[in-house]
Amino acid sequence: MADPTPADEGTAAAILKQAIAGDRSLVEVAEGISNQALLRMACEVRQVSDRQPRFTATSVLRVDVTPRGRLRFVLDGSSDDAYVASEDYFKRCGDQPTYRGFAVVVLTANEDHVHSLAVPPLVLLHRLSLFRPTDLRDFELVCLLMYLENCPRSHATPSLFVKVSAWLGVVARHASPFERVRCLLLRSCHWILNTLMCMAGVKPFDDELVLPHWYMAHYLLANNPPPVLSALFCATPQSSALQLPGPVPRTDCVAYNPAGVMGSCWNSKDLRSALVYWWLSGSPKRRTSSLFYRFC
């Protein structure tokens, strides 16, 4: 069995090879594979009674960390310097009857193909979950994730990266391993932060937390590449059996930032259609907390 190359060392396949060869303990294998899972395509969900829902990935236009380590946001529709404390926005959302929480997609790192997801629409319905934070820290993390995914290149600066990384480090030091959703949010933010740094031409804090297809795209899609190279970063067209089981809904209720460096997947109609179909279906919405088994 061939040894994994340095670029492959963090992948699930490489971890399994090392486990079979006896080079890793069972605990290391479990942790290594679970670290490949992350949340993507976070967006706020709002709906008034039975009217058309609204999915917004751009409600947070800017994030800042104060000298005291507090998060504050510039919200959609506000001026560039109209910062709102994260706790105030948390309370505001909780008080609004239209606020439903956040929709998120569970992926492995290798399923993010830059311009699309390597998950067919039918399967995507089972990867979506609804997250309605009851704790300020979790709310801050999902808002930060949503912002990083839609961060425009003009905001992707070393100053932002350092502030966000330091804040995540503080949150991680106080997070219990039993806070499964919080740990998943932290891991997701680290994946997106390091990948965003790579795409912005800044040395990532951790090269192993750069999404693999994005790492390749950073080099291969520069300088107007031929279509054959661009096609590598779009998922393979799926058969009709893997499409949505009903009529494709309208997707004009999904708001995202086309200029977001990490948000190009939002251009995929399959993703937007699956999101709206999932929400409008009569089936109960899986909660993000239910993604984890309880052993005690």
Swiss-Prot record:
Name recorded for this polypeptide: Cytoplasmic envelopment protein 1
Family: Belongs to the herpesviridae cytoplasmic envelopment protein 1 family.
Biological source species: Human herpesvirus 2 (strain HG52) (HHV-2)
Top-level division of the source organism's lineage: Viruses
GO annotations of cellular component type: host cell Golgi apparatus; viral tegument
HAMAP family in the cross-refs: HSV_CEP1 (MF_04038)
Record keywords, A-Z: Host cytoplasm, Host Golgi apparatus, Virion, Virion tegument
Physiological role: Plays a critical role in cytoplasmic virus egress. Participates in the final step of tegumentation and envelope acquisition within the host cytoplasm.
Location within or outside the cell: Virion; Virion tegument; Host cytoplasm; Host Golgi apparatus
A Pfam family the protein falls into: Herpes_UL7
